[in-house]
């Protein structure tokens, strides 16, 4: 939601998940790749089979240059979104750049993006709601909704084990970012997803201020949150099962 709002300003970069694509397929992780190691057919049967892709043969310099070009607005501001599970992909890509100053994440970011980076940490206080949304999305492969609510019969099915698996991943990702910020002595701009949903325009304005840009450029929300009564029902049902079975919440 935030990246769409920032992109709509036309001055805050063109943020996308530039780091999500696997070099072996040129695709983002597919549903089953989120469940590597899972053998429960009740879960796997709800996920689409893997699709072949095309190997990305760009050099590290070509990858970096294209990434910078695509993510930058005419005023020179670049924007992008990095998930913790994509860090290893970024490190592998950056390893091919010449004159590396180090092999760690901070060095990779500095050498790909430059040293003048504003870190914005978007977090969701409730991992259950996030895991339910993601579980529904990996089944339908519909990740955002800009017009209508999810269809009541979109084909997605409830499965507590599937939700629990994603909740563990999401919890570990959040911990990874917080540990990294602390280790690097960084104080990112903290953006709660709850606040973002409640008032997208005000939250975007806060980010624009942090970037030294005009907060009045914050647009009305371009996306509708992908959540509805069915997702809420699943979250409530999962919390009951989590209490009994020790699933993450």
Across the structure, where does each feature detected by a protein language model lie?
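PAPS-dependent sulfotransferase catalytic domain
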Residues: 74-179, 188, 201-216
């Amino acid at each position: 939601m935030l990246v769409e709002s920032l992109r709509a300003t036309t001055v805050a970069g063109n943020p996308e998940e530039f780091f999500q694509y696997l070099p072996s397929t040129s695709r983002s992780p597919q549903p089953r790749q989120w469940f590597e190691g899972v053998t429960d057919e009740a879960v796997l049967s709800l996920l689409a089979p893997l699709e072949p892709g095309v190997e990305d043969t760009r050099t590290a310099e070509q990858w970096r240059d294209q990434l910078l070009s695509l993510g930058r607005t005419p005023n020179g501001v670049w924007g992008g979104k990095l998930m913790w599970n994509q860090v290893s992909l970024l490190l592998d890509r950056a390893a091919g750049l010449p004159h590396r100053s180090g092999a760690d994440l901070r060095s990779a970011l500095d050498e790909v993006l430059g040293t003048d980076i504003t870190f914005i940490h978007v977090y969701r206080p409730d991992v259950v709601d996030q895991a339910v949304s993601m579980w529904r999305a990996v089944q339908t492969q519909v990740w955002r909704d800009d017009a209508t609510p999810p269809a009541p019969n979109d084909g997605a099915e409830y499965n507590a084990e599937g939700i629990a698996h994603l909740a563990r991943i999401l919890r570990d990702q959040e911990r990874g970012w917080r540990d990294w910020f602390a280790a690097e002595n960084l104080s990112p701009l903290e953006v709660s997803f709850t606040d973002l949903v409640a008032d997208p325009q005000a939250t975007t304005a806060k980010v624009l201020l942090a970037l030294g840009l005009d907060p009045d450029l914050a647009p009305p929300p371009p996306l509708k949150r992908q959540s509805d009564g069915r997702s809420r029902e699943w979250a409530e049902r999962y919390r009951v099962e989590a209490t009994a079975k020790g699933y993450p919440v």
